[in-house]
A protein has these predicted regions:
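Conserved alpha-helix/loop element of class I SAM-dependent methyltransferases that forms part
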Residues: 7-8, 42-45, 56-75
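Class I SAM-dependent methyltransferase Rossmann-like catalytic core
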Residues: 49-55
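Cytosolic histidine kinase catalytic core of two-component systems
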Residues: 19-20, 60, 109
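N-terminal auxiliary segments of SAM/dcSAM-dependent transferases
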Residues: 1-37
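Conserved nucleotide-cofactor-binding alpha/beta core module
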Residues: 70-144
Length: 144
């Protein structure tokens, strides 16, 4: 299965509906957010291991959550448990140059992995994402 086939299946199943969200899903390739050992499975509609007992969420689940969130350009969003950064990058694409996503991940090595993945799209350099390691249970006081 290809990236476009995965996205089209999620659209066909009714989980992706909003044009700006669909556009972001099409631009942000899940394959860039999975460990090397799982690149071949990146387009399977299933969670995949990303290390440390964690997974990258099932694409259908991410689509469902983002559709419910209804993010808009210019929004400020906190992504708690950002993991490999896939959802963070999708949200950064949606909020655009006037928005910001604060991503927080408890596990240090995953935070490093997620930050590196998000950086592939220059979202950190562009100021759309701030990716930090820490406990997100209290949010990011003063930021999100």
């Amino acid at each position: 299965m290809t990236h476009n086939e995965l996205i089209n299946n999620i659209i066909k199943d009714g989980y992706l509906k909003t044009p700006r969200i669909i556009k972001a899903f099409k631009k942000i390739d899940r394959k860039n957010f999975v460990p090397e050992d799982f690149k071949e499975e990146a387009y399977v509609n299933a969670p995949l291991p990303i290390g440390f007992g964690q997974t990258i969420s099932q694409p259908l689940t991410v689509a469902f959550m983002i559709e419910l969130l209804e993010p808009e350009p210019g929004n400020i969003i906190l992504d708690v448990g950002a993991g490999s950064g896939w959802q963070t990058a999708i949200l950064a694409e949606i909020v655009g140059k006037y928005g910001k996503v604060f991503a927080i991940e408890l596990i240090e090595k995953l935070a490093e992995f997620g930050k590196a993945n998000v950086d592939k799209y220059d979202f950190i350099k562009k100021g759309r994402v701030e990716f930090v390691q820490g406990d997100g249970s209290l949010g990011l006081p003063g930021k999100a």
